[in-house]
C-alpha cells in the first residue's frame, strides 16, 4: 500500500517517464531525448496506446491515485506529464 506522504509534492519527471516506457512497453528513449522531443507524438517514440495504458496503470498503482481518462488520450510526453502532475498535485 502506498503511504500517503509519498504522494505529497510528487511529480513525474521525464526520467521516470523514460524508465516507465522501457519497463512497461519495451520502448527505450533516453531522458534528455525525451525532454528535447517532448512535443513529439508518442508514436514517434514507438509507444502505442496500449503501452501508454500500461504506464498509466503503473502510475496509478505507485501513487494510489486514479488518473482521469484524458490522461490515456494524451498524444505527447509534455501533455501527458502536465496532465499527470496536475492530477497528483490535487490528489489528497
From Swiss-Prot:
InterPro entries: ACP-like_sf (IPR036736), PP-bd_ACP (IPR009081), Ppantetheine_attach_site (IPR006162). Residues 11-92 form the Carrier domain. Keywords: Phosphopantetheine, Phosphoprotein. Transmembrane segments: none annotated. Gene3D superfamilies: ACP-like. 4'-phosphopantetheine is transferred from CoA to a specific serine of the apo-ACP-like protein. PROSITE patterns: CARRIER, PHOSPHOPANTETHEINE. The modification O-(pantetheine 4'-phosphoryl)serine is found at residue 49. Pfam families: PP-binding. Signal peptide: none annotated. The keyword Phosphoprotein applies. Involved in developmentally regulated synthesis of a compound biosynthetically related to polyketide antibiotics which is essential for spore color in Streptomyces halstedii. This is Probable acyl carrier protein. It comes from Streptomyces halstedii.
Amino acid at each position: 500500500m502506498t503511504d500517503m506522504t509519498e504522494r505529497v509534492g510528487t511529480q513525474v519527471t521525464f526520467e521516470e517517464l523514460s524508465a516507465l516506457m522501457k519497463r512497461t512497453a519495451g520502448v527505450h528513449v533516453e531522458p534528455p531525448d525525451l525532454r528535447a522531443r517532448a512535443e513529439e507524438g508518442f508514436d514517434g517514440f514507438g509507444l502505442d496506446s496500449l503501452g501508454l495504458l500500461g504506464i498509466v496503470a503503473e502510475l496509478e498503482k505507485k501513487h494510489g491515485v486514479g488518473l482521469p481518462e484524458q490522461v490515456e488520450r494524451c498524444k505527447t510526453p509534455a501533455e501527458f506529464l502536465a496532465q499527470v502532475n496536475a492530477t497528483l498535485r490535487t490528489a489528497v
